[in-house]
């Protein structure tokens, strides 16, 4: 059960700390990758040359890599004698040689203590953990993605739990009739309304794409079409499943994960992962890929007695 002894506010509006959520945020492969580095030329010099060196770096901007802009250009350190010295990223290793940089410095009247290769983080950090580790290698900029910050109220978690229990019952009943024992619901937290509930119907309809998620998305579309055709007020049209929450018994397959992405959902919550066919916790990580034009939050691991499904089944 969801914990309710949480906040100073009323139980309904109280926010639940993330540590008390009954599920865990699924991080993308980019958020869990280990430190990867790229070699760059670093120049070490006294602070009095800072203006000339930074101007020089600007002049050779064509030799820079935009992919390294997350690395702070300059860092301050103390030498063996306790004196302040500056270190600056000149350019990637392949762009110039140390001799070329040294010759340019000599022409500009810059005295460098040392020009050396150094491995800096190759990618920007996406999590607190990555930031703390990578920033110790070389200072990097980090801005927590606003879409990664989520809030659940006690009422909302209880409501989602109730929806999930109904889904488990529906999936179990469907399984007894020869279908794959999984189910999905689409929920609007802003109106506290369940817009669609569906089970898998591949066997019943003799159609391999009638997965529970695709059926639920279709029901939302039909509901919205009917509302538009019969409305008498000036209410706005809903764009697909924008900002909605999807609750499932099992991890969706790649097709359904993409269907949810195209439908512009805000978040997905499910109990059990499908390690061989899932589109979320696999390397696909479809819910949060930088190269796609939409991303949604995904949570899993809610310990509920969902029907058992073979690992090679595409949910």
Swiss-Prot record:
Q: What is its main location?
A: cytoplasm
* Lineage, top ranks: Eukaryota, Fungi, Dikarya, Ascomycota, Taphrinomycotina
- Report quaternary structure and partners: Heterodimer with Tad2.
- Protein name listed in UniProt: tRNA-specific adenosine deaminase subunit tad3
Give the top-rank taxon of the lineage listed in the UniProt record for this protein: Eukaryota
The listed locations are: Cytoplasm; Nucleus
| Annotated Pfam families | dCMP_cyt_deam_1
Keyword entries, A-Z: Cytoplasm, Metal-binding, Nucleus, tRNA processing, Zinc
CMP/dCMP-type deaminase domain residues are 158-299
Question: What molecular function terms (GO) are annotated for this protein?
Answer: catalytic activity; enzyme regulator activity
List positions binding Zn(2+). Answer: 211, 253, 256
The Gene Ontology biological process annotation of the record reads: tRNA wobble adenosine to inosine editing
Which protein family is named in the record?
A: Belongs to the cytidine and deoxycytidylate deaminase family. ADAT3 subfamily.
């Amino acid at each position: 059960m969801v914990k309710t002894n949480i906040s100073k506010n009323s139980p309904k509006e109280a926010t639940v700390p993330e540590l008390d959520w009954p599920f865990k945020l699924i991080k993308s492969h980019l958020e869990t990758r280990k430190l990867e580095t790229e070699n760059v030329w670093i120049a070490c010099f006294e602070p009095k040359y800072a203006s000339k060196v930074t101007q020089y770096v600007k002049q050779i901007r064509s030799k820079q890599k935009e992919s390294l802009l997350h690395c702070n250009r300059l860092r301050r350190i103390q030498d063996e004698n306790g004196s302040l010295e500056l270190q600056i990223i000149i350019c990637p290793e392949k762009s110039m040689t140390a001799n070329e940089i040294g010759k340019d410095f000599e022409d500009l009247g810059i005295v460098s203590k040392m020009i050396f290769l150094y491995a800096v983080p190759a990618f920007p950090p996406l999590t607190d953990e990555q930031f703390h580790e990578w920033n110790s290698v070389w200072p990097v900029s980090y801005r927590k993605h606003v879409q990664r910050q989520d809030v659940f109220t006690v009422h909302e978690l209880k409501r989602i739990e109730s929806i999930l229990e109904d889904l488990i019952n529906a999936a179990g009943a469907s399984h007894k009739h020869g279908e794959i024992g999984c189910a999905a619901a689409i929920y609007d937290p802003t109106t506290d309304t369940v817009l669609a509930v569906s089970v898998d119907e591949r066997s019943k309809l003799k159609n391999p794409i009638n997965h529970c998620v695709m059926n639920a998305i279709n029901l939302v579309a039909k509901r919205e079409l009917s509302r538009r055709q019969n409305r008498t007020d000036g209410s706005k049209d809903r764009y697909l499943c924008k900002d909605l929450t999807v609750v499932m018994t099992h991890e969706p397959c790649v097709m359904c994960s993409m269907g949810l992405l195209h439908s512009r959902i805000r978040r997905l919550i499910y109990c059990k992962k499908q390690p061989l066919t899932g589109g979320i916790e696999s390397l696909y990580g479809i819910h949060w890929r930088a190269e796609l034009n939409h991303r949604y939050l995904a949570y899993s691991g809610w310990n509920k007695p969902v029907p058992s499904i073979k690992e090679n089944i595409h949910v």
